[in-house]
Design a protein with these regions (language model features):
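A generic local secondary-structure boundary/capping motif
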Residues: 39-41, 49-52, 87-90, 122, ...
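Small-aliphatic-rich amphipathic alpha-helix that forms the alpha element of a beta-alpha
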Residues: 74-100, 116-127, 205-217, 224-235
Length: 342
């Protein structure tokens, strides 16, 4: 079987395949709003999933995510795609309950490749403590895979992405740069060490970061995916606050900055920059570092907003778990931009 043919890497694999945020905002604004007192979180905001109240003690989190391959190994692709889809449940403050496969695959190609993808995905659902209970498949010229995931949470304890409080510290739980690393690896522009670090990061469930963080007073949370670090951080401000970012403290895969310095960036990063025009102000931040902050991430880390007096202890717990986390900034009174990067 020709795995490389089946797993042909498209121009935009992983979360780089997302539609531009500006386009999505315009389209979603044309959808009728559904009014239901039990719908706690819908699509009227840019949260990571929907939350629907079933009883006084139980609400469900509903989310889905799928994309085209960003790696040639089908088993690894399955694990990354599943980890990415499962992440939204943790970003909403819940635990994974059940998942369904979403499959697009050419029927004339080797089913063993699809079996490897599904095995990788199933292992991640199992690691998350969830149950994989079926799915849906269609014949397609291009391979795509992901999950529809249902999580559970107490109706009073779900997380939003836009409920930061003044004085909060923001923590990032994975290094940035996987978008540029994956895009350039196919052209031989990336060191193997950086590539392996990107693969490890994308396969790591955000379950562990969330479980550590849930012991603290989390005010807001989200995960970093296709809209990049700054795009998702912008959603956290809700246009009410300004988040001051110290760029020198942000962790990234070393090779990503080198790629940016050589102008080997991604189209998705440029779309993110265009969308954030007027919302982000850079102060003496090198262009290459700006690109790292705008880079679309696949299965990226969590952004957690916590009280300043709890940040140090949370960082200790994350470090004890060997999660490459960092404090990236703080929530301040509203200034002339949603985000100011120093």
């Amino acid at each position: 079987m020709d795995i490389k043919k089946i797993m042909k890497l498209p121009a935009c694999g992983g979360c780089m395949a997302k539609l531009p945020p500006g386009m999505l905002k315009d389209v979603v604004s044309q959808i009728p709003v559904f009014n239901d007192p039990n719908l706690l979180v819908g699509f009227d905001t840019s949260d990571d999933g929907a939350v629907y109240k079933l009883s006084d003690d139980i609400a469900i989190i509903q989310t889905l995510d799928f994309f085209t391959p960003m790696v040639e190994d089908p088993y690894t692709f399955g694990k990354i795609a599943a980890a990415n889809a499962l992440s939204d449940v943790y970003a909403m403050g819940g635990r994974v309950a059940v998942a369904l496969n979403i499959v697009c695959f050419p029927e004339e190609d080797d089913p063993a490749v699809l079996a490897s993808i599904l095995r990788g995905g199933a292992e991640k659902v199992m690691e998350a403590g969830g149950v994989l209970c079926g799915g849906h498949s269609i014949n397609d010229r291009e391979c795509k895979y992901g999950l529809s995931v249902t999580g559970v949470v107490h109706p009073d304890k779900y997380l939003r992405n836009n409920t930061c409080k003044k004085g909060d510290v923001i923590i990032l739980t994975k290094p940035l740069g996987v978008g540029m690393i994956m895009a350039s690896y196919r052209y031989g522009e990336v060191a193997e060490e950086d590539y392996q670090q990107a693969l490890k990061s994308m396969q790591t469930l955000n379950k562990y970061a969330f479980e550590a963080a849930s012991k603290f007073h989390l005010h807001a949370g989200t995960d970093v995916t296709g809209f990049g670090f700054l795009g998702h951080l912008n959603e956290m401000t809700n246009d009410d606050y300004t988040i001051a970012v110290e760029s020198k403290g942000i962790k990234y895969i070393p090779g990503a900055l080198k790629l940016a310095q050589e102008f080997l960036t991604t189209g998705g990063g440029q779309k993110n920059r265009n969308f954030l025009k007027g919302k982000v102000r850079f102060q003496n931040v090198p262009d290459a570092m700006q690109e790292v902050l705008l880079d679309p991430q696949t299965s990226g880390g969590m952004l957690l907003s916590v009280p300043a007096n709890e940040a140090k202890e949370l960082m200790k717990e994350l470090n004890d778990l060997e999660l490459p986390s960092c404090i990236i900034g703080e929530v301040q009174e509203r200034q002339d931009a949603n985000i100011i990067v120093y």
